Amino acid sequence: MATITSDPVVRPVPQILAHEVIAPRKTKRWVDWVLTTDHKKIGIMYLVLTGVFFCMGGVEALMMRTQLSVPNNTLLTSEHYNQLLTMHGTTMIFLFVVPVWAGFGNYFLPLMIGARDMAFPRLNALSFWMLAFGGIVFYATLFWHPPDAGWWSYPPLSESLYSPSGGQDAWIFLIHLTGISSLLGAINFYVTIVNMRAPGMSWNRLPLFIWSLLVYAILLIIALPVVAAAVTMLLADRHFGTHFFDPTDHGSPVLWQHLFWFFGHPEVYIMILPGFGVVSEVIPVFSRKPIFGYKAIAAATAVIAFLATLVWAHHLFASPLPIVVLSFFMLSSFLIGVPTGVKIFNWIATLWRGSLVMTTALWFTIGFIAIFIIGGITGIFLAVFPVDWQLNDTYFVVAHFHYVLMGGAVFTVFAGLYYWYPKITGRLLNERLGKASFWVMFFGFNATFFVQHALGLSGMPRRIYTYQPGLGWSTYNLISTIGSYILGVGVLLTIINIYRSLTKGQIAGPDPWKGNTLEWFTPSPPPVNNFDEVPRVRSVEPMRDIRRQVERQTGVIQKGGGSEQFARSS
């Protein structure tokens, strides 16, 4: 069994770092940020921008849940509800989850592999500003007519006959801009990882978070050209007289579904795999054990990426596909659960008999595992196409989608935030407030989405803006709405925590958690050039090796410090 440490004693330990200790630096002029090519500043701007979009998407979700809290509610019209639904889904997927990992990757990829910057710094800056510009244009549609065809924009609903406003064109413009931004970033990530690793950092010594970013980049390079072609064809249908998706003139709406979901299902793992990488970094640090099955986890990441390109048609089970095709995609959907299960069992094995230090980051990773397992189980139900025929377009699908994506992405984003915030800012977040945020979010999330399985089983369809009383949906919808507000309070606690810690947080030092990877070899926050001298990497845990070397040289055994410092941060 694991040993749990909840209130450890702070003990001073020798600090190991590449530079002299420096106090957190004040932010420079805004012009320096606008023109910067420093990967760390670009990473921070990604995180701030995506955090803003996350909050906006959350407000949109609360408005929709409020509308559905009681039958025959008149808070929103059907038109406004469809617009909010489209804005919420598009924001969370294209403006939050995918680019937030670009933010973490931009900041930590060079630090973790011993590089001084990304391979293409100017391209890096261009990627960020394309994302920002696309988001601004998309949200500018609030002032005339937002898109209302859903974040997937299925034709013929998204064709000019049914969506004549410029809002739908703004959606297409956003997909192009964010797609180009992500594609350029993915190329940058790939080249940096392949060519700029520290001496001795072979592929079997690469941090697991970097493995996940490598696969994230490869999937983006594979999937994004497909959706770019699809939205270009849709734009041509709307403005240039083509009929790719127009069923009245030999077009096929199902073609859009194939193109969109060939991108869309790899996109699910694009959003989740970096979160898996965060979990693989956080658990061994706070378990005080090496990761169990390093090679198996790295291999499982690659296998998931391969299988992710073979399961897209399970989103089309309700369309007219031959039984043999349905059977193939059902089996491939089952199969993709195997490498995911390998990861989960390896994480649990790492926790088992570890000396657990129950920080907020570790709580968020444990919460992720619990939530993601539930999402995976419901996914098995939906992978059986006769079952999917019954549950298709019901709230059961909504519940599954959020358990997988919010559990797999949002909870791991928060885990990464609490884990790496001291390195970014030089200050610790308040652990008491952080744990309160976790428990409120965890309870609110399950209250919001678990009951939606029951809504789906009782027949409530997706994408309806109101419903009649007496259908058995009212109580579940009210519970779900209350849960969504509780979830929002949990997020707000973390926002307050971040704001307070920027000025009042305890100084973190270079290695507050006693980490395993090279980013902890630098001061907090790191200097412009990251490293004066990059150490030779001799294992998958280079910082542990460096600490052992210092212990041998100084004769001082580090029996504490690191993560124990969090006890004073509250």
Please report, for each region that a protein language model flagged, where it lies by residue.
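Membrane-embedded and interfacial regions of multi-pass energy-transducing membrane proteins
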Residues: 2-570
